[in-house]
Amino acid sequence: MHFHFSKMHGLGNDFMVVDCLTQNIFFSPDLIRRLADRNRGIGFDQLLVVEAPYDPETDFHYRIFNSDGTEVEQCGNGARCFARFVRMKGLTNRTTILVSTKKGKMSLKVEDDDQITVNMGEPQFEPNKIPFKATQAEKTYLLRAEDKTLFCGAVSMGNPHCVTVVDDVDNYDVDKYGPLVEGHERFPERVNAGFMEIVSPSEIKLRVYERGAGETQACGSGACAAVAVGIMQELLEEDVKVSLPGGDLRIVWQGPGKPLFMTGPATHVYDGQLSI
């Protein structure tokens, strides 16, 4: 059988996006891994699948699979690409789109300048909601990673994140400490590991080692998590520019009890057809 797909990216975090409203495809973990192979397949960080809404109050259901075949709860860069895809393919003409995910609902808004703003919901700091092994919520935790003790924050943006403030993120050994944090025993479902350099109270530099995908050019939910942790640690203001290897995002959060908003681009690269 064959199916149609689009290749897209959000600041270099790249996706294969498939409409499963008009096509019936089962993506097994093995098939996803083969498609994600950058030498023998299409190559991508995540597979995004558009499905019919599970909830009558939503427009679509949004599924995300990492390149290792695991299904995950959230992908902020993917959400922006999802919004552009469903409009580009004529699946909706709405500028505000409500989608359900594995762990909740999200509102996606197409701005006048073609940027996409995603309501990411309220950051969750309770350890059992992340999940993270701790007796109570703290602004900072100590995490042992081989020869280092990391001072980090833990938060869920619909998916788990661990954020560590570092002095020089460009030269930080993300290849070493990313996997150590991702698979740390205190995160029973593994975790996305973010490493944040504070440039000013309104700007950070960030690198993210994503759970199941490795370091990516950009991680939208990771940018949200970093700003949320920075605000809780009283290091950042409520409107922050996040500079990632692939480009910049704007994150706005007014603090506990309020939703967090992410604004950034979504780029269509090409459309294709595959036989499987």
Swiss-Prot record:
Its EC number is 5.1.1.7. Keywords: Amino-acid biosynthesis, Cytoplasm, Isomerase, Lysine biosynthesis. Its main location: cytoplasm. The keyword Cytoplasm applies. One of its GO terms (cellular component) is cytosol. One of its GO terms (molecular function) is diaminopimelate epimerase activity. It is found in: Cytoplasm. Transmembrane segments: none annotated. InterPro entries: DAP_epimerase_AS (IPR018510), DAP_epimerase_DapF (IPR001653). It comes from the Bacteria. HAMAP family: DAP_epimerase. This is Diaminopimelate epimerase. The lineage of its organism: Bacteria, Pseudomonadati, Pseudomonadota, Gammaproteobacteria, Vibrionales. The gene is dapF.
